[in-house]
């Protein structure tokens, strides 16, 4: 004899935000899903730190700049900032400065101002020690936060673990079994104070395989 089951489903969607990493880890740990929170991306944090150095010292006042990754390895990542000068046949990209995150033997990281062109960025040259300290501060602050994209990745992982699937023609809307809502709602309650809106609603199912990804 076939057993009865509740065929109702729930729809889920959310608006993500940049939040403290500790808040995300606490929320997902509450439902034993802390491994879904992506680890800090040292390279992207370094790119954002470089952008803050550019803003703090007016490096872009003389024209647009672009960050580029330096070849690195497991224990070091680096970013260089170059001036972007559009040309008729090719663009010119003169070097301005570079910073790196270097892993120490104790597992911690040290942020260094690796190189700079004193003629191109005299404000960096005059205050290179201050710039290095700022880069270290900016980088650590960035690592302590989870980006909106990373939070979306974590929430998506949670919904998938709860048996959810994406409804293609409803935008970024997911369907999940109603009996799996507890974990979603618990994470939603813990993240709400940080400006994250996780919304869910119950609706009867309507099967259409073209909507399922």
What does each model-identified segment do?
Residues 1-119, 125-135:
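Charge-rich, low-complexity segments
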Residues 2, 26-39, 46-47, 51, ...:
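Terminal interaction module
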Residues 98-184:
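Internal, hydrophobic cores of structured domains that mediate oligomerization or house catalytic pockets
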